[in-house]
């Protein structure tokens, strides 16, 4: 699942790695179904919307700094890329 890069940008390669991690179909775009799978993976309520609760759960799961973000910000994406690279 290794991305081999850490740039903080959630582009198609990062999206595809997230999809593989959560067991979704891999097309490089995060669908509502993918987001729900991500939420289940990190222990957040699966509503299909990335908000502050999902971000806190994701940041906890991957060991990222909890920064109060309401979306997949660059710092969290960078931490997620590192986490996925280590898998």
Residue ranges and their predicted role:
Residues 1-87:
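Cell-envelope/ECM-targeting effectors and their regulatory/trafficking segments
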């Amino acid at each position: 699942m290794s991305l081999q890069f850490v740039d903080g940008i959630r582009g198609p390669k990062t999206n595809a790695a997230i999809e593989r991690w959560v067991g979704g179909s891999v097309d490089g775009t995060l669908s509502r179904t993918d987001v729900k799978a991500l939420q289940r993976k990190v222990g957040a309520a699966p509503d299909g919307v990335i908000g502050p609760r999902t971000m806190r759960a994701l940041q906890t799961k991957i060991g990222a700094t909890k920064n109060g973000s309401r979306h997949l910000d660059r710092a969290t994406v960078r931490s997620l890329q590192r986490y996925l690279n280590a898998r």
